[in-house]
Amino acid sequence: MTDVTIPTERGPMPAHLATPAGPGPWPGVVVIHDALGMSRDIRAQADWLAGEGFLAVAPDLFHGSRRSTCLFSLFRGWVPRGDLDAARNWLADRRDCTGRIGVIGFCMGGGFALAVASDHDFAAASVNYGGLTKEVERALPRACPIVGSFGTKDRWPGVREVPDRLEPILTAANIDHDIERYPNVGHGFMNDHDPGDLSIVDRTIAKVVAARYDEPATRDARARIAAFFRRHLGDAPPASDGPGAAT
């Protein structure tokens, strides 16, 4: 694992790169953080994907701006499409990448993953408790294959209904998908944040939306995501020795 910098139209974008052990090339995955930004948790998400045989990069989408400024822009419909395209292209241009790239996102990042599932050259998308805007919904008939994971106890506004909106559209468009609703888990169940990463406001919001890490649901969701990515990104046998150091 190592820190890298990806050139974008907004300037250099810091990112965490996790490389599988053993010889490449490997399929790639762009890992999109939640509203907390870059953290130990999102690095760990990239690392487990590398352990499954995927070259994973987690870009800092808040680069060059305050987190509060980016979150304010989010409520006005901000989607960092240029940064995500830059991360995808950066992976695709590497000699240790096969050129088949997926995208995965959590919470805010799950909504971004849905947004770039259509018309952005990703081969598969993993959407984890992400929101769905009307604009993104209209583009879904052109989406890549989607694997989605949601909690039935999620209290984030609108998210619990996303699976019921996704499935009919993807089915009608004949797009391969795997949408799972996990019983008795809430928002953010795959994100195991350090307490020090959470402000008082973050902790309050987490309580309101029933956000809590759930190990059994996470284990099952990760297995489904890895299998779905292997099917659509190409061969990526699990790396028995875990992620290795990137160069």
Segments predicted by a language model, with ranges:
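Primarily recognizes the serine-hydrolase "nucleophile elbow" in alpha/beta-hydrolase
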Residues: 86-143
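Serine-hydrolase catalytic machinery in alpha/beta-hydrolase-like enzymes
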Residues: 3-96, 193-212
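Short, proline-enriched alpha-helix->beta-strand connector loops that line the catalytic pocket
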Residues: 141-146, 174-176
